């Protein structure tokens, strides 16, 4: 019964992860396009410079010119000379993460902490491929992200820093919290942000604890649930 219940909870959590990560991706792109406009950066030149540094993307772009969803958009331009808004629209999320890091370094942009982007990509990919995200919660062999620790310390004033570091050594937990922080930091639309945060709060307060008696013997699951729930509740909707 516990495994069946947990798999259902995991499915609902994956749904939220996919929805939230899409919202974060959209907001990251909107924010970076705004910065490019404000800095008066040439919209074609920035793409050509990136492609020159990472020419592997040329093949990806060329392959996408024949896909139903973006071929009309890409067909308006001579390959591989695309304006930045088109480039960001058609590249996969993993490539966008790389571009975002490149842009932050080259143009001194500090819109969002780049060290969390790989965590977000990892949990987004896991959810999209229907991999379990509530997984191996006793494994704390990973490395915690110092920036993420500093953010969580501010959210959990009554929890020792060492405890926070210990919890974030679990890769699945660290990735989830990274996405939650991104929702708070990146999404500028208050309606969209509030919707994302309210959805995850309702999941933690509702479906996750509907059959809580099934998990009385799982100390690690209870600890991680309480840890994540406190963060979810302290990242308050505006």
Per-region residue spans from a language model:
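Short, contiguous, well-structured surface segments enriched in hydrophobic/aromatic residues
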Residues: 1-115, 134-135, 170-172, 182-193
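Polyanionic, low-complexity intrinsically disordered segments
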Residues: 87, 97-122, 132-238
């Amino acid at each position: 019964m516990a495994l069946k219940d947990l798999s259902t909870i995991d499915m609902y959590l994956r749904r939220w992860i996919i929805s939230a990560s899409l919202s974060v991706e959209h907001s990251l792109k909107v924010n970076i396009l705004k910065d490019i406009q404000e800095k008066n950066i040439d919209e074609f030149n920035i793409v050509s410079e990136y492609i020159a540094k990472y020419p592997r993307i040329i093949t990806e772009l060329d392959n996408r010119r024949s896909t139903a969803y973006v071929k009309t958009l890409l067909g308006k331009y001579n390959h591989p000379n695309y304006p930045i808004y088109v480039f960001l629209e058609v590249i996969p999320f993993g490539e966008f993460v790389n571009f975002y890091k490149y842009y932050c370094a080259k143009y001194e942009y500090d819109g969002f902490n780049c060290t969390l982007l790989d965590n977000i990509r990892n949990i987004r990919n896991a959810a999209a491929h229907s991999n379990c995200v509530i997984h191996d919660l006793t494994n704390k062999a990973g490395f915690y992200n110092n920036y993420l620790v500093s953010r969580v310390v501010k959210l959990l004033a009554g929890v020792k820093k060492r405890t926070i570091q210990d919890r974030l050594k679990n890769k699945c937990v660290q990735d989830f919290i990274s996405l939650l922080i991104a929702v708070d930091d990146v999404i500028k639309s208050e309606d969209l942000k509030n919707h994302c945060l309210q959805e995850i709060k309702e999941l933690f307060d509702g479906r996750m604890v509907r059959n809580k008696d099934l998990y009385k013997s799982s100390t690690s699951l209870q600890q991680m649930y309480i840890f994540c729930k406190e963060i979810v509740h302290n990242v308050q909707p505006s």
